[in-house]
């Protein structure tokens, strides 16, 4: 049976989804599971949780714990699959720093984990650690597949694919939920008859085709999107809305509360949580995979000191990621007992790609995924060294990506503005030169639209100093 190593196993809820899924899969249920983390308490909590699932499911997985950098190589030794879910520097202090220093310069952000100055510095903290993983893997499990879930996805996956020999694919939820989110939001409903084609880059891949029973849904999507952004789309009663957005399935309490808040906001003000994406679709012609709060900071159009009214007009949640971190910390306190001290804990297989990929590689039964891979002629009007997100087939032969050809020119053009930052950040991680960090941030669409070159350099210098414990190579 395969060995699965989970890097960052203290991500307890995510470990439950990925490794719980493996325990629910016949081809993987007897796997040897190696949990690795640098936080003793979180590692122990994840192990307790997974042991309960293993026992209650009747699985025969062998669960092992590896604590700290000195045990990392042993955790990886002989692995067939390595799942990466680390965060270097955590919420406090690094995420706080990623928001507070730019704010001093007048640069406002929403999520700051994928692009912009926050995304660049998150990548520069993380790439050296992941390359350490890669060096160990090249020694003790050179044929393993690395399944990367950590952001910034394109930068980290691109670094692994160009700076190591490890077979790597980047995985993100946004492709899976793109069409269901769009169609349900617009009261069109999503079902198995819907077929889609999605390609581009992570967090900015494009819904190129969306059909139901062969009928192009885009004309109706755009008609409803315009009404929705004008506050004129009829969305029904709360009970009808809830059933539509949840596909009739039960929701965790916190999600239902947030959906109700969104519903009430729309009823009261005509504003909603996806206004940026729908505006981009109406202007560029195609819907983007990742959320409005992300895409508000990937472009120069929405967060602008000169036009402060855009924040309210498009319902842009500035400083959203720190709020989420605080909420997750608070919610973890209530979930800890449920997950780590519940002897009857069970699990239902989720939609996470990881177990389906491993199952396909073990059994040879193929599965289609959206994967982040190197652009070796896949999207012909994007740079060849870019990390692109395209449909892929996983089977016993590995990951086979699909050739897309040219994207619509306006879509490729917007992607290239983000790719510039991604490639320059990977170059900065390779050269360890401050000048390359400056260039990466200078190329960022949102940052360069708001700050002068001198301010960008000063901001980067201050960020480097603040992050010196996690980025000693640049200090």
Predicted regions and their residues:
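An anion/phosphate-binding loop that grips the pyrophosphate of nucleotide cofactors and donors
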Residues: 79
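Long, compositionally biased stretches enriched for glycine and/or charged residues
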Residues: 190-475
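N-terminal Rossmann-like dinucleotide-binding module
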Residues: 2-29
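Rossmann-fold NAD(P)-binding glycine/threonine-rich loop
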Residues: 92-162
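Glycine-rich phosphate-binding loop and adjoining beta1-alpha1-beta2 segment
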Residues: 24-58
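Short acidic low-complexity segments
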Residues: 63-76
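Conserved NAD(P)H cofactor-binding loop of Rossmann-fold oxidoreductase domains
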Residues: 86-89
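Internal, well-ordered domain-core segments that constitute the primary functional module
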Residues: 133-221
């Amino acid at each position: 049976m395969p060995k699965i190593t989970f890097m960052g196993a203290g991500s307890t809820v995510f470990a439950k989804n990925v490794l719980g899924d493996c325990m629910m899969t016949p081809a993987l249920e007897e796997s040897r599971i190696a949990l690795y983390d640098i936080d003793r308490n979180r590692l122990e909590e994840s192990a307790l949780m997974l042991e309960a699932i293993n026992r209650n499911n009747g699985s025969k997985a062998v669960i092992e714990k590896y604590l700290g950098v000195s045990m990392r190589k042993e955790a990886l030794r002989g692995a067939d699959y390595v799942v990466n879910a680390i965060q270097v520097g955590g919420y406090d202090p690094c995420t706080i720093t990623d928001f507070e220093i730019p704010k001093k310069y007048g640069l406002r952000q929403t999520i700051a984990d994928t692009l912009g100055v926050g995304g660049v510095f998150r990548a520069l903290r993380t790439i050296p650690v992941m390359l350490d993983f890669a060096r160990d893997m090249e020694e003790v499990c050179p044929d393993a597949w690395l399944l990367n879930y950590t952001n910034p996805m394109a930068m980290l996956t691109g670094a692994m694919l160009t700076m190591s020999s490890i077979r790597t694919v980047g995985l993100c939820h946004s492709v899976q939920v793109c069409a269901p989110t769009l169609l349900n939001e617009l009261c069109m409903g999503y079902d198995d008859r819907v077929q889609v084609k999605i390609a581009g880059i992570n967090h900015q891949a494009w819904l190129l085709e969306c059909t139901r029973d062969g009928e192009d849904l885009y004309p109706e999507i755009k008609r409803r999107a315009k009404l929705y952004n004008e506050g004129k789309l009829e969305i029904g009663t709360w009970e009808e809305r809830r059933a539509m957005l949840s596909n009739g399935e039960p929701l965790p309490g916190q999600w239902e509360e947030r959906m109700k808040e969104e519903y009430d906001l729309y009823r009261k003000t005509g504003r909603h949580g996806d206004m940026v994406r729908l505006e981009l679709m109406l202007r560029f012609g195609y819907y983007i995979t990742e959320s409005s709060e992300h895409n508000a900071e990937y472009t120069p159009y929405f967060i602008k000191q000169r036009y402060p009214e855009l924040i309210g007009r498009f319902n842009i949640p500035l400083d959203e990621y720190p709020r989420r971190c605080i909420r997750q910390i608070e919610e973890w306190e209530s979930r800890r007992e449920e997950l780590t001290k519940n002897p009857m804990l069970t699990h239902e297989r989720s939609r996470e790609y990881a177990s389906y990929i491993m199952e396909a590689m073990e059994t040879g039964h193929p599965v289609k995924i959206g994967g982040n891979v190197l652009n070796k002629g896949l999207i012909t009007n994007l740079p060849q060294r870019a990390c692109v997100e395209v449909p892929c087939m996983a089977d016993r032969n590995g990951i086979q990506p699909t050739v897309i050809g040219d994207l619509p020119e306006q879509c490729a053009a917007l992607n290239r503005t983000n790719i510039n930052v991604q490639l320059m950040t990977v170059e900065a991680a390779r050269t360890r030169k401050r000048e390359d960090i400056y260039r990466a941030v200078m190329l960022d669409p949102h940052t360069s639209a708001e700050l002068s070159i001198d301010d960008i350099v000063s901001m980067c210098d201050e960020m480097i100093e603040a992050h010196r414990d996690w980025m000693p190579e640049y200090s």
